[in-house]
């Protein structure tokens, strides 16, 4: 069912897009050291292809300095938007989601935030105690609950309906069907909601 048709017949609200950019500042000497270790067993012909892919991996996206900038940008955008409702931040990995949670939680003006990921207790460390995904789902679906921002990587991107969710921050490459499913989280009708916003 095409999105434009669902908007035209009033089933959903339009989705608006706002492009934002937090650049990756990569130190080539560190990339090359890690890269050389990883591709030592690979044929020489594939090294150039692998080198291009290596530059965009989770490690670079999840650098502390970049996460600080993204967290500040998300919180600043969230508290200065004119929309009422809730927001979702989509990250590349559980590690990044957990790190982003710790950063945002410490910010003075940040909304109440939670991280919703699957994983074992050892991996998630201290935030696991705060995680109860069923309870978080109940809270996030309640428009009156102060929980305003959730950080996810894969969970809640499909089949999760929260009509008052109106902003999605994408910090993860998505494409095709997965992208369409994810951005459709913000186009549900709710009271006087005029549209959903995807910030990338």
Set out the residue ranges of the language-model regions.
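Short secondary-structure boundary/capping segments
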Residues: 31-33, 103-108, 127-130, 165-168, ...
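Conserved nucleotide-binding/hydrolysis micro-motifs of P-loop NTPases
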Residues: 21-26, 94-96, 120-122, 156-158, ...
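Short glycine-/polar-rich loops that comprise or flank the Walker A/P-loop
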Residues: 1, 9-15, 84-85, 109-112, ...
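Conserved segment of the helicase C-terminal RecA-like domain
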Residues: 146, 179, 183-200
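SF2 helicase motor core recognition
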Residues: 151-165, 184-189
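Conserved C-terminal RecA-like helicase domain
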Residues: 51-152
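Interdomain helical connector at the RecA1-RecA2 junction of SF1/SF2 helicase-like NTPases
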Residues: 1-84, 101
């Amino acid at each position: 069912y095409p999105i434009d048709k669902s908007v035209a017949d009033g089933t959903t609200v339009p989705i608006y897009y706002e492009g934002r950019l937090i650049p990756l500042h990569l130190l080539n000497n560190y990339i090359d050291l890690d890269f050389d270790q990883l591709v030592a067993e690979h044929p020489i012909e594939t090294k150039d292809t692998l080198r291009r892919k290596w530059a965009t991996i989770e490690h670079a996206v999840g650098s502390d300095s970049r996460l600080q900038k993204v967290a500040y940008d998300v919180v600043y955008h969230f508290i200065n938007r004119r929309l009422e409702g809730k927001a979702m931040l989509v990250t590349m990995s559980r590690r990044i989601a957990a790190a982003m949670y710790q950063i945002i939680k410490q910010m003075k003006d940040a909304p109440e935030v939670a991280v919703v990921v699957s994983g074992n207790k050892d991996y998630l460390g201290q935030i696991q105690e705060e995680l109860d995904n069923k309870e978080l789902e109940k809270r996030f679906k309640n428009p009156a609950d102060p929980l305003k921002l959730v950080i996810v990587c894969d969970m809640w991107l499909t089949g999760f309906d929260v009509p008052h969710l109106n902003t999605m921050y994408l910090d993860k490459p998505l494409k095709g069907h997965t992208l369409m499913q994810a951005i459709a989280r913000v186009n549900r009708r709710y009271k006087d909601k005029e549209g959903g916003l995807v910030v990338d």
